[in-house]
């Protein structure tokens, strides 16, 4: 049977009975968490990070940065972020805006990270270095320089 469900873009969930977006998000988060437990399935919910995350001291998103409602972080069993640091922090760009490597050639893979910030079922936090292969829209590992 089905063991995993995916919900793309949590902030698009709306409920007619909710008076505010925050109320709708809090209710949806709780309902999804309960449903996962009752059906004994994993429900992966993709959510947007608020703009304030870019102002974090380390430049990385944290649980409090999930846009519109922090209930998502409280109700989940695992919380992870795919993060692509600002490329300008690492590499210059050519006249077309494409990042360049040390050899002056366009980069095919740019820096990225998979950040585990909560894991109630495992080892806890982790930072995994990845690369983002833009031509294919894929995250790859390990990062080769």
Predicted regions and their residues:
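Helical hairpin unit composed of two closely spaced alpha helices linked by a short loop
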Residues: 2-45
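C-terminal regions of RecA-like/P-loop NTPase motor modules
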Residues: 1-2, 19, 31-39, 52-145
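Short, ordered loop/turn segments at secondary-structure junctions
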Residues: 10, 48-49, 84-85
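Short, active-site-adjacent cap segments at secondary-structure transitions
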Residues: 12-14, 50-54
């Amino acid at each position: 049977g089905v063991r995993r469900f995916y919900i793309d873009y949590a902030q698009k969930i709306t409920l007619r009975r909710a008076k505010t977006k925050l109320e709708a998000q809090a209710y949806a988060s709780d309902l999804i968490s309960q449903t996962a437990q009752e059906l004994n399935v994993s429900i992966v919910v993709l959510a947007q990070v608020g703009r304030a995350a870019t102002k974090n001291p380390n430049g990385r998103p944290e649980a409090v940065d999930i846009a519109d409602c922090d209930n998502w972080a409280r109700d989940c069993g695992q919380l992870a972020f795919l993060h692509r640091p600002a490329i300008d922090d690492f590499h210059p760009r050519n006249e077309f805006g494409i990042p360049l490597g040390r050899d002056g050639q366009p980069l095919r893979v740019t820096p990225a990270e998979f950040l585990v910030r909560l894991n109630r079922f495992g080892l806890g936090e982790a930072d995994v270095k990845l690369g983002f292969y833009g031509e294919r829209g894929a995250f790859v590992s390990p990062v080769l320089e």
